[in-house]
């Protein structure tokens, strides 16, 4: 994948950054694409770096993801909760599966969606081959993860656990407005504020 380079003029001459490093200077992390261990490690490292830079200043996590590996997503989620710096989440495009869970896990009052973004929650997917006893062990594990993910969505959204369990039995798609009513986000933003306010 080709990553654009940004060139800035400084008092000491020119300085070039890849676009993601330049965004990081403004405390913006971009999570685009499927979530796996590699992506999770990069996002976690950026969260920890920005926390060390200024633990009181907002971090802005932009999400455009179809979801991915549950344990990788949970590693990002737990880090968001662990650090002191408030994490604002913004859905651009889509936040599905683990992407939706991360979107809901932003600082309350600072969870956003752009106008035409789509949000989707569902139960975790899994496939395992092997001996019958191993398949049974993995089935039990995925059921435990399903229960925990539903509890987190219920806690973050304010919905009853029973409703979340029913809604996640199948793919449950939402517009920004529907996600706001559900409690996954707090507001829809059509334009970035010109001064002050959230990003």
UniProtKB/Swiss-Prot annotation:
Q: What is its EC number?
A: 3.4.21.92
**Single Gene Ontology MF annotation:** serine-type endopeptidase activity
* GO BP term, example: protein quality control for misfolded or incompletely synthesized proteins
The record's top EC class is: hydrolase
**Which cellular components does GO assign to this protein?**
cytoplasm; endopeptidase Clp complex
Subcellular localization(s) per the UniProt record = Cytoplasm
The reaction(s) annotated as catalysed by this protein in its Swiss-Prot or TrEMBL entry are: Hydrolysis of proteins to small peptides in the presence of ATP and magnesium. alpha-casein is the usual test substrate. In the absence of ATP, only oligopeptides shorter than five residues are hydrolyzed (such as succinyl-Leu-Tyr-|-NHMec, and Leu-Tyr-Leu-|-Tyr-Trp, in which cleavage of the -Tyr-|-Leu- and -Tyr-|-Trp bonds also occurs)
Q: Which residues does UniProt assign to the signal peptide?
A: none
- InterPro entries noted in UniProt: ClpP (IPR001907), ClpP/crotonase-like_dom_sf (IPR029045), ClpP/TepA (IPR023562), ClpP_Ser_AS (IPR018215)
Asked if the Swiss-Prot or TrEMBL record annotates the protein with the keyword Oxidoreductase, the reply is: no
Please provide the record's keywords in A-Z order: Cytoplasm, Hydrolase, Protease, Serine protease
Q: Which cysteines are joined by disulfide bonds?
A: none
At the top level, the lineage of the source is Bacteria
SUPFAM superfamilies on file? ClpP/crotonase (SSF52096)
User: What positions constitute the catalytic site?
Assistant: 97 (nucleophile), 122
Similarity comment: family membership: Belongs to the peptidase S14 family.
Primary role:
Cleaves peptides in various proteins in a process that requires ATP hydrolysis. Has a chymotrypsin-like activity. Plays a major role in the degradation of misfolded proteins.
NCBIfam families given in the database record: clpP, PRK00277.1, PRK12553.1
Per UniProt, subunit arrangement is:
Fourteen ClpP subunits assemble into 2 heptameric rings which stack back to back to give a disk-like structure with a central cavity, resembling the structure of eukaryotic proteasomes.
Q: Know the name of this protein?
A: ATP-dependent Clp protease proteolytic subunit
Annotated organism of origin? Geobacter metallireducens (strain ATCC 53774 / DSM 7210 / GS-15)
């Amino acid at each position: 994948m080709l990553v654009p380079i940004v060139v800035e003029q400084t008092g000491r001459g020119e300085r070039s950054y890849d676009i993601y490093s330049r965004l990081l200077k403004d405390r913006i992390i971009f999570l685009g694409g499927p979530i796996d261990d590699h992506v999770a490690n990069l996002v976690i490292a950026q969260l920890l770096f920005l926390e060390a830079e200024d633990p009181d200043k907002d971090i802005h996590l932009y999400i455009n993801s179809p979801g991915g590996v549950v344990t990788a997503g949970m590693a990002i989620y737990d880090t968001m909760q662990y650090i002191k710096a408030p994490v604002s989440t913004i859905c651009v495009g889509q936040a599905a599966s683990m992407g939706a869970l991360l979107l809901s896990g932003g600082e309350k009052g600072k969870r956003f969606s752009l106008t035409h973004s789509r949000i989707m929650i569902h139960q975790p997917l899994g496939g395992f081959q092997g001996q019958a006893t191993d398949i049974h062990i993995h089935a039990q594990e995925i059921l435990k993860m399903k229960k925990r993910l539903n509890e987190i969505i219920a806690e973050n959204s304010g919905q009853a656990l029973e409703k979340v369990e029913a809604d996640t039995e199948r793919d449950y798609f939402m517009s920004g407005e529907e996600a706001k009513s559900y409690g996954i986000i707090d507001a829809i933003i059509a334009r970035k504020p010109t001064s002050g306010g959230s990003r």
